[in-house]
Curated annotation (Swiss-Prot):
S-adenosyl-L-methionine binds at H58, R67, G91, D113, E142. InterPro entries: Arg_MeTrfase, PRMT_dom, SAM-dependent_MTases_sf. The keyword Methyltransferase applies. The active site is at E156, E165. Residues 1-37, 300-324 are annotated as: Disordered. Belongs to the class I-like SAM-binding methyltransferase superfamily. Protein arginine N-methyltransferase family. PRMT6 subfamily. This is Probable protein arginine N-methyltransferase 6.2. The lineage of its organism: Eukaryota, Viridiplantae, Streptophyta, Embryophyta, Tracheophyta.
Length: 395
């Protein structure tokens, strides 16, 4: 499920995990609304879209009950803002979210996807006798035409560590071109978190395994094993027991106000205190998204203050739920697992930490200049009287 354009070129395609969405469009009745010129669709984009036409990625997403049920609950929670309205599903995939919106009473749903899975979505819509309500458009969000404004935009745009694949830009494109003033965006807000972790089992499986293999000494393989296992970010599931400190907030996104250039580079500082004595094996990213109605929009300054590098405390005292708390989809280690898992940056050499030991530094996440869907990650941290730097590319 795919939304929009990225930098072109040949080379390493993004890992085919969950599908990325294709976008949709629309404007006011009559002349299509004016908007920014669409980015070109490159050969690289076409190969990327083709990779996600495979049924497996959609099966994985639909079998993620946390993800799918949270979206369905959020749609029904906002039924009063969806019933009788026009909805745009940016990157519809199999069309499940579009159909949920139709069940919630939407007058019309434009379901858009750039991958060939859109052809299957058409059949699914027809099978459910919703062709009079759900209009499937096969194309990029930047290229399709819809001759009316929309009241609601829904999209499952999140990639690994929230921002991988750069699909949020396509949601922004759709918002600026077609969303009516005061319209609804689901999800409405997102937060990206970072925390130091310990994971001895991972080192045992990937590195220390080579010390003795069937009675044969293979320690000479360990340096290569570390390079292969820990050079790039790793997507895997950890538990709350692996996390050494309360997380810090790397970025917060308000989908009502965020602009695409703000996503090009994000920098945040952190200052952690280890809650136990354990080896520091790396750092973990995870995210959550909220489903807020328009009346709960935050100011642009408040919503994006972390994009300016300000750190916020994400401890439980700052995450207490209020009576009117929004629906939240979380990928945190302590919550039910999802297909996003967590994104881990492992160190080549563990660092022994004492209880209450300090770890401070900064993290910078930037879109790759070669392939906009890739992320460059630079982690700088200071502990035990020494500075360290970990640089990785999420691709």
């Amino acid at each position: 499920m795919f939304a929009g354009g990225a930098d072109g070129g040949n080379g390493h395609l993004p890992r085919p995990r969950r599908a990325r969405r294709g976008g949709g469009g629309g404007g006011g009745m009559g002349s299509p609304p004016l908007g920014p010129p669409p980015p070109p669709c490159t050969d690289y984009d076409m190969a990327y879209f083709k990779a996600y036409s495979h049924i497996g990625v959609h099966e994985e997403m639909l079998k993620d009950h946390v993800r799918t049920n949270t979206y369905r609950n959020a749609i029904m929670h906002h039924q009063d803002l969806i019933s009788g309205k026009v909805v745009l599903d940016v990157g519809c995939g199999t069309g499940v979210l579009s159909i949920f919106c139709a069940f919630a009473g939407a007058a019309r749903v434009y379901a858009v996807d750039a991958s060939d899975i859109a052809l299957q979505a058409m059949e699914i819509v027809r099978e459910n006798e919703l062709s009079d309500k759900v209009i499937v458009l096969h194309g990029r969000i930047e290229d399709v035409e819809i001759e009316e404004k929309v009241d609601v935009i829904i999209s499952e745009w999140m990639g690994y560590m929230l921002l991988y694949e750069s699909m949020l830009g396509s949601v922004i494109f759709a918002r600026d071109k077609w969303l009516k003033p005061g319209g609804l965006i689901l999800p409405s807000h997102a937060s990206l978190y970072l925390a130091p972790i310990t994971n001895s089992h991972r080192y045992q499986d990937s590195v220390y395994f080579w010390q003795d293999v069937y009675g044969i000494k293979m320690s000479s393989m360990m340096p290569l094993a570390k390079q292969c296992a820990f050079m790039e970010p790793s997507v895997e599931t950890i538990s709350g027991e692996n996390v050494l400190t309360w997380p810090s907030v790397v970025a917060q996104v308000d989908c009502y106000t965020i602009q695409a250039p703000e996503l090009e580079t994000i920098t945040a500082t952190f200052n952690y205190t280890s809650m136990l004595q354990a080896p520091l094996h790396g750092f973990a990213f995870w995210f959550d998204v909220e489903f807020n109605g328009p009346v709960r929009q935050r100011s642009k300054k408040q919503a994006n203050q972390c994009l300016d590098g300000n750190t916020q405390d994400a401890s439980p005292s700052n995450k207490k739920k209020k009576a009117d708390a929004p629906i939240v989809l979380s990928t945190a280690p302590e919550d039910a697992p999802t297909h996003w898992q967590q994104t881990l940056l492992y160190l080549f050499e563990p660092i022994e930490l004492k209880k209450d030991q300090n770890i401070e530094g900064s993290v910078t996440i930037s879109q790759s200049q070669q392939h906009a869907r890739f992320l460059n990650i630079c982690l700088k941290y200071f502990t035990r009287d020494q500075w360290y730097v970990k640089e990785s590319v999420m691709k």
